[in-house]
């Protein structure tokens, strides 16, 4: 049960729409200096790199983490160096946004906060020259869920199950029996996350563990999220093994029969189940890849059209700071959000465009605040310190905030001595009204929630460091998601648009790590296509 819950709660969002500027408003919270607010899309254009390219083996549309990693994977794993990455905005990295007040000792994230240090992500980091900049969280740091007014630790391993108080004894027994297969059989249709978890593990696991994890990972509604699409690894356990435990045993047996190849000796070995970042924040990764790719990355290049060329490949037309530029490409991979890809692809295939337009991205706001250490409630301290990854809030518990990450506890050098840094997420599928709130209203909502369980009600007002609203933040893997994605790919194939690939988080998954893994998968597909068709 603990393993299943953990597997469903490990993702971190990785791409989003450009943020929305929040109008300045009078705030009741005390502030020092400049508050970093959201920046509207269409930042000042950067000049194109000298020596504009007019052709490429592969054009990567989108300079977020998926696109940049695809380009680097093509070069490092497949020897495909004739690649062009085009980004409409003036900076690379998508919604990876690290902010800093260097003089005051604050460093924080306004998009994704961390990643699971899987081997593909570590490989990308090492290949980008960032091995020595990796930082890892404490694998023993607790995670908390708010329940009945109290922050309760979440079990991190099966041995913790008898001792944690988030669930009742009957709830634990129900979960254990369900995991063993004593539960109703699958219904023969695509299940929502809620239906799957309630059927397999019971109401308590869903309401007290999985529902808040869905809010924290997807900012989504678990009654609408597809179990198969959103948490496929756990779904496959039952599908292949007859039950969650049966599938786990079968997976272990299969691994024994098919051992992994030797691990790359260059990669560091994280201790336990943890998360990671970089010394100066997540933005170090896209910046490092961009630096290595050099003039192959074009910023402020807005794609206006794409057409199939008569001599194979594709012709792409861009508006750039230096005028209109046409690019001829043997292959194209679109790593932009699905709703942007839909508009661009509509002249090629209305069926593909229609399928891509279905995917939903709810709004999410990231609100970063700091309190003095003494503002933390004593009962929330461990050995006199705020320790842990953070906390999640079930929608049933009467708070608006989805969850809070203890940024200053998770990684070093994120806040000055004597201060705690908290990154709070608010909004999502069940609270879309945040886009109409002012900056001060969002801060007040976060501060009000924190004073219910973590912050002393009489503590001083927080120092507000950043408020960033992502109007279209995280793609929702709803029931039917995989069918819609397959429909889009099939429509492109039937239309004769071979060599045109779809990528990004709505394809690979919302976690930053899945975006990197998906980039390696896309690079392999592109390389195979070039070898079989385009190079002949």
UniProtKB/Swiss-Prot annotation:
EC category: oxidoreductase
Keyword Chloroplast: yes
Catalysis performed (reactions): protoporphyrinogen IX + 3 O2 = protoporphyrin IX + 3 H2O2
Note on how the cofactor is bound: Binds 1 FAD per subunit.
Gene Ontology MF terms: flavin adenine dinucleotide binding; oxygen-dependent protoporphyrinogen oxidase activity
Cofactor requirement: FAD
UniProt entry tagged with the keyword Cell membrane: no
Any one annotated GO CC term: chloroplast
Annotated binding of FAD, by residue: 62-67, 87-88, 111-114, 510-512
Function according to Swiss-Prot or TrEMBL: Catalyzes the 6-electron oxidation of protoporphyrinogen-IX to form protoporphyrin-IX.
Protein name: Protoporphyrinogen oxidase, chloroplastic
Provenance organism: Oryza sativa subsp. japonica
Lineage, highest ranks first: Eukaryota, Viridiplantae, Streptophyta, Embryophyta, Tracheophyta
């Amino acid at each position: 049960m603990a393993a299943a819950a953990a597997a469903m709660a490990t993702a971190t969002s990785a791409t989003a729409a450009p943020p929305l500027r929040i109008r300045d408003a009078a705030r009741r919270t005390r502030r020092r200096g400049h508050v970093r607010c959201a920046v509207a899309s269409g930042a000042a254009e950067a000049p194109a790199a000298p020596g504009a390219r007019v052709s490429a083996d592969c054009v990567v549309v989108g300079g977020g983490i998926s696109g940049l990693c695809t380009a680097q994977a093509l070069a490092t794993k497949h020897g495909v160096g004739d690649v062009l990455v085009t980004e409409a905005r003036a900076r690379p990295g998508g919604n990876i946004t690290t902010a800093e007040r260097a003089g005051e000792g604050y460093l924080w994230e306004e998009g994704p906060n961390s990643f699971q240090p899987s081997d593909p992500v570590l490989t990308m980091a090492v290949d980008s020259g960032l091995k020595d900049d990796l930082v890892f969280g404490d694998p023993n740091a607790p995670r908390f869920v708010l329940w009945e007014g109290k922050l309760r630790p979440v079990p991190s391993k099966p041995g913790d199950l008898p001792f944690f108080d988030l669930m009742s004894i009957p709830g634990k027994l129900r979960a254990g029996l369900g995991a063993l297969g004593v539960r109703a059989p699958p219904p023969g249709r695509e299940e929502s996350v809620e239906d799957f978890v309630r059927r397999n593990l019971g109401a308590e696991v869903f309401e007290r563990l999985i529902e808040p994890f869905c809010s924290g990972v997807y900012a989504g509604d678990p009654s609408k999220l597809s179990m198969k699409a959103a948490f496929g690894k756990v779904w496959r356990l039952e599908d292949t093994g007859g039950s969650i435990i049966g599938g786990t045993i079968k997976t272990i047996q299969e691994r024994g029969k098919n051992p992994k190849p030797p691990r790359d000796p260059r990669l560091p070995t994280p201790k336990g189940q943890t998360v990671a970042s970089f010394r100066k924040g997540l933005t170090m990764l896209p910046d490092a890849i961009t630096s290595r790719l050099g003039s192959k990355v074009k910023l402020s290049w807005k794609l206006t059209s794409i057409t199939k060329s008569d001599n194979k490949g594709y012709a792409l037309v861009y508006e750039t700071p230096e005028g209109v530029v046409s690019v001829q490409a043997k292959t194209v991979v679109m790593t932009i959000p699905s709703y942007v890809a839909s508009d661009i692809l509509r002249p090629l295939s209305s069926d593909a465009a229609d399928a891509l337009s279905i995917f939903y991205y709810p709004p999410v706001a990231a609100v970063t605040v700091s309190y003095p250490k003494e503002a933390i409630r004593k009962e929330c301290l461990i050995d006199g310190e705020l320790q842990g990854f953070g906390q999640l809030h079930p929608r049933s518990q009467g708070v608006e905030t989805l969850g809070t990450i203890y940024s200053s506890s998770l990684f070093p050098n994120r806040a000055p001595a004597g201060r705690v840094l908290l990154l709070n997420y608010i909004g999502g599928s069940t609270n879309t009204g945040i886009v109409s709130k002012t900056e001060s209203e969002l801060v007040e909502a976060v501060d009000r929630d924190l004073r219910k369980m973590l912050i002393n009600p009489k503590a001083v007002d927080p120092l507000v460091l950043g408020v960033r609203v992502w109007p279209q933040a995280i793609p929702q893997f709803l029931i039917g998601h995989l069918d819609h994605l397959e429909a889009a790919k099939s429509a492109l194939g039937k239309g004769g648009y071979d060599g045109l690939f779809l990528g990004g988080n709505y394809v690979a998954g919302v976690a930053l790590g899945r975006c990197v893994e998906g980039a390696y998968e896309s690079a392999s597909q592109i390389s195979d296509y070039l070898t079989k068709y385009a190079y002949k």
